[in-house]
Amino acid sequence: AKNSDVAKKIERGLVGGLFNLKGVAKIRDVQKLAVENSRLGIPLLFGMDVIHGYETIFPIPLGLSCTWDMAAIQESARIAAVEASADGISWTFSPMVDISRDPRWGRVSEGNGEDPFLGGAIAKAMVYGYQGANLDDQLKRNDEILACVKHFALYGAGEAGRDYNTVDMSRNRMFNEYMYPYEAAVEAGVGSVMASFNEIDGVPATANKWLMTDVLRKQWGFNGFVVTDFTGISEMIEHGIGDLQTVSARALNAGIDMDMVSEGFAGTLKKSVMSGKVSMKALDAACRRILAAKYKLGLFDNPYKYCDLDRPTRDIFTKEHRAAARRIAAESFVLLKNGNVKRHPG
């Protein structure tokens, strides 16, 4: 609604993107608000958790991994991108590539299992499906959307399978068993990375400079932008890191570019720059990376690139898409056979 609190923030230039707004007509109206009513006219990103299909639903990621068919997995992401983009979505919070070996963790089904090699292959297939398979030509079409690999890093390795919990492991195990799928997504050109909630070496990932800068950018060469998970910045207050200004400054200095929901960046970074806690160079770099993603998506040339009102009826839940989903679902089936294996009494 044009008179809502969010609309007023958009007009003031305080919003860089929205998530979970569904419907191309609604998205077009909000994009128009940003482009025509804000001072700088910077277009918004519109994101959604498009995890295993949009309207045409594919097997959950754990099920897709059972196909061991990278072409089929890439096809599923491609169809999801076509449908989501037809409804105004330009950014998906996928693929989720967290390796997990503890069945007590509640999000095992969103990942691809225990094997980092398989996870890396699937990460690449999903990114290619969403963004396009040609690294030199990604995101040019209006049916290709920005991917976001998550949750960086080690989100599936929390102690005792408890969500948001601490992660304590050697570098050897970390890089041999858990990190490759994230790196593989970077190799495939993924445009954004989402930080995880857990801590590593006693430092929350959202404020972990070693993770976000030394590994992700310097070691792997990632040049996209990093976004927090939902309220990832403000949740560090409960973890004892500091007040909202302190945790926001630590996140930006660590390499976080976009604050999801916490509003710590919008509310405190000006004070942090003035007090010297954050440099203008660091703030400019974060802004530049987000703007670069919007340029790469073509939103400055055409803010309504993903707002063709005729596309939903043409491209969503089509007969061809449903047939592909049925075929890939059948390929994912795993049958267990009772072979009368001898059991030794324990």
Model region roles, listed by residue range:
Residues 1-346:
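Glycoside hydrolase catalytic-domain context in secreted enzymes
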